Structures are given as structure tokens and as C-alpha cells.
């Protein structure tokens, strides 16, 4: 995946921000209830970093359980919506690309929803090393994403097994990275990188995962 595609992906989410909730979730009230349930089950606490916070639906739930939430996203239009939605005193937002962002602290929990599947395969290992560097000593990574069974709903570009074409409501087309999550495969890959990871399903469409750095990297 080229840098051009990654830049186009950010541009897509900038342009989609105003219509994101409706097109991603449909019934936003039902989505909020599901999100609240999942976050309560995952129990994020302490200092939480949310990567790719989008319009703030997950941030809203994280704020209820975390001591402090730092929420970042590369799309300023999405962050503006999130700031308006979530005005909790324990939440701060930043417009930032996670791959170039530098934190002034380490985090007890790093959380992301519908983000891992947008990480290019060529950046997968670097991304998880970045997470390791951002975690406190006993920290954990929590994530939600789409199960590989949902792959059929996307239109993959010819010869590009991780690049799909997405359209906005106005018809504009964008290239976006999309690597759906196969739970067993993800557990295996992270194990090879020195993570203890458990990935399960939540309904037919989503996966939920928890990962911690293993005490000894596997060889």
C-alpha cells in the first residue's frame, strides 16, 4: 500500500465525517447501547489513549469508565464533531496521525475501534511496536473491529487484496485500506510479535480483542 492510498484514506474520513454516524451505524441509538455494553465489558480504566476516535461515539463511553482519555484522529472534521459530542472534563482531543504522534506519557489502556483493519499490512508490525512503546508496564490494548466474514460487503480493487473502493453519499470515490480481522490469524501473528492476545466475536459482524505484551517474546 502506497503513502498515496493512506493519504486518500484520511481524506475519505475527512469528507465522510458529517455522514459517518448514519452510514456506519444506521440506528445510532442502538449503536450507542451496543458500544456502552462493550466498553463496560472491556473495563478500560486509568489513562486511556483512543486511536482514530472518529466522531466520538466510543469516546463518549470510554469517558464513563476511564480516569483520563486522550483521543486522537487524523481527520479534523471528525474531531470537531467528537469535541462537540463529548464535553467530559476527563477527555482531551488531538488532531494527529498515530504514526507520527508523540505522547508525553504512557497509557494504561490503548483502545481503537474499526481502526486495525485500516492499518496496511506493511505497517502492521511497526504499529504494534508503537503500541508497545506507548503502554505502561502493565498496560493492555483493547480493540473492536469487523470480522473477516464481513469482507463480501466491500469492493476490492483488481489485484489489490487490501485496498477497497468506498463512495460517499455524493458519489465521490476513494481508495481505503481494509484488512478484515480473522481472530485465529490475528492471535497467531501477534503471538509471533510477542503479544498475548485473545480475540472473540461480538455478534455476527464484530470482533473484540485484548492484547498484552508477553512476559517473554516468542521466538
Predicted segment positions?
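Conserved class I S-adenosyl-L-methionine
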Residues: 1-43, 46-54
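Class I SAM-dependent methyltransferase SAM/SAH-binding core
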Residues: 55-100
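A conserved beta-strand element that flanks and buttresses the S-adenosyl-L-methionine
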Residues: 111
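Short catalytic micro-motifs in class I SAM-dependent methyltransferases
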Residues: 114-115
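A short glycine-rich, Lys/Arg-flanked "PGG" loop and its adjoining helix->strand segment in the class I
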Residues: 125-137
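C-terminal alpha-helical "lid/dimerization" subdomain adjacent to the S-adenosyl-L-methionine
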Residues: 144-190
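Conserved Class I S-adenosyl-L-methionine
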Residues: 180-212
